[in-house]
Amino acid sequence: MNIAYRFRIYPTEEQKILLGKTFGCCRFLYNQMLNDKIREYEKTKKMLKNTPAMYKKEYPFLKEIDSLALANVQLHLEKAYKNFFRDSKIGFPRFKSKHHSKNSYTTNVVNGNILVESKRIRLPKLKWIAMKKHREPAEGLRLKSVTVSMEPSGKYFASLLYEGYSCENQAAGPDYSTAKILGIDYAMQGMAVFSEKVETEEAGFFRKNEKRLAREQRKLSRCVRGSHNYELQKKKVARCHEKIRNQRRDHLHKLSRKIADGYDAAAVEDIDMKAMGQCLHFGKSVQDNGYGMFREMLDYKLAWKGKKMIKVDRFFPSSKKCCKCGRIKKELKLSERVYHCVCGNKMDRDRNAAINIREEARRMLTA
């Protein structure tokens, strides 16, 4: 199993120039290769098998950067095509924009060309770069590749991908009829409601910083596009977004770790977050609480410990079903936040749904 560690790096001005050139060359090569594939298919109805080496003679500036970064461009383009042919909903590979694409490139470990020390990292063409290594990777891992990226705020990061990470073995598995399973139901307020009490911090980081972000964006709108002040203010806006994103990710990492450590399994409803944000006009709430990101984090952290995350069918009547007697209501409006049943059960509708999700997952595991 692979595991990645992300560290901040501090390149010199000379190294920043070379990094910028590498980002640009990778983007340029990706667009050129994609364009040639499209043109060849339009002419011959066959897929062109082009490689980075085919472009170095015509564009000699490609020789100035790491050749492995260019090789990974080819791999990324081929993966984009495979994803498209596997599922057309993903969409056809798109050209990368200079102003809206992520600035990053990936290089591989070959013959010791990458070295990692406590306070620095050596990369091809860049030599040694200062790095803040805030944690040590697990022992016994082998470095596979490094992805260098630049955030809109101007910060640089190196993501080190290691292979050989071993998950905790739970081959026997617990007795799921009595195992500790946590049911999780999506909620607009607070991201999720659990089948039992789980201490968590209040989320909604975007709304907490919304006024400050709006103020910085207003200042940006008054600046002349392309001016020095415009570029400075643009970075301030980017730092606001970065802070919100970091707060959200930190909160979700801590919460998912607590659940993965404390439970044998977790059960969630298999809902389409993208469709929910578009159809129910709750886009801001859906994106702010990061429920989709939380599910991904919880899934791989449970897998690390040899545990399971069970996805209950989205059409399972978790909200309409009474968790006490099992009766199912014919209708339940979204505005009804408290669940009432003829058996006398009265509780928060999301809590009722979370309990039903937990018990349905237990049934699925013991079936």
Predicted stretch roles:
Residues 1-367:
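Nucleic-acid substrate recognition interfaces
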